[in-house]
């Protein structure tokens, strides 16, 4: 079945995740002083909460494309990136367990989401790949190999910096733009 559609199961799950992401955005961005009770943990300073909230809004927009879009090839590249993010969030949760609002409904929702997502998101990607024609549409821009290689290089550098910051956060705390 190579018709480049987004399958109903993929759409439905993406739609549910969008609801979680929009809710997280609302709490983190508009109610940063209430993250201790309304979110999985208390985030300080408030600017960090708003920063995370804006990232969740970006994720909601991307996954809304999977929930409401038409073509699989337009959204398929997001799924591996979301998988990496959810794995990192699960690891961060386990590493910083004591900082979470354990036993609260927001934390339980967080924990379930980040235990299930690292498996569910790649499973959806594999499931929906059977519809991919691997052919660009006539209106699609074909990116040159040079641009793709430069982008991969930059992406690799960013991934390296993020990985270092993830495991050695003190290296970045002093240069974080707000404290």
Model-derived features with residue positions:
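Hydrophobic alpha-helical transmembrane segments and adjacent interfacial helices
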Residues: 25, 29, 84-99, 156-167
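Residues within membrane-spanning alpha-helices of integral membrane proteins
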Residues: 11-14, 18-21, 53-56, 79, ...
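Surface-exposed interaction/gating patches
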Residues: 7-26, 134-179
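Membrane-interface interhelical loops and short amphipathic "cap" helices
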Residues: 30-45, 99-107, 167-179
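Structural signature of hydrophobic alpha-helical transmembrane segments
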Residues: 45-55
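Hydrophobic, ordered structural segments
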Residues: 58-145
